[in-house]
């Protein structure tokens, strides 16, 4: 689901500003890598067992830690309902 979320966001932004879409996609990648390297760096999520990363003021990445694996569950616009 997270990949579909991310793709939808990037495609939408790219319609008006391809450079901004690329920059945001790189930021999504960097935040996901930070979560992989330091899984507890970001705040506890609203759903038990999840954590949340604010990516710019408008986007949130929700992930969970299972053992040594960090799984990004969703990438949402801040205005979207979660959970």
Task: Outline where the language-model segments fall.
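Arg/Lys-rich, positively charged N-terminal/basic patches that mediate binding to nucleic acids
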Residues: 1-23
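Short amphipathic alpha-helical/adjacent loop interface patches that line ligand
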Residues: 6, 25-28, 32, 39
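Hydrophobic side chains within alpha-helical segments
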Residues: 8-9, 34, 60, 74
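Short arginine-rich
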Residues: 11-15, 35-40
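Amphipathic alpha-helical recognition patches that constitute DNA-binding helices
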Residues: 20-23, 27, 49, 71
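Basic/aromatic recognition patch in beta-strand/loop cores that engages polyanionic ligands
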Residues: 29, 37-68
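Enriched for short, Lys/Arg-rich terminal
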Residues: 59-60, 64-83
């Amino acid at each position: 689901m997270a990949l579909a979320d991310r793709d939808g966001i990037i495609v939408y932004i790219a319609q008006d500003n391809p450079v901004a879409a690329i920059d945001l996609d790189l930021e999504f990648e960097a935040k996901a890598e930070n979560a992989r390297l330091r899984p507890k760096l970001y705040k506890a999520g609203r759903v038990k067992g999840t954590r949340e990363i604010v990516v710019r003021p408008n986007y949130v990445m929700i992930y969970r830690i299972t053992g040594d694996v960090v799984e990004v569950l969703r990438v949402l616009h801040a205005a979207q309902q979660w959970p």
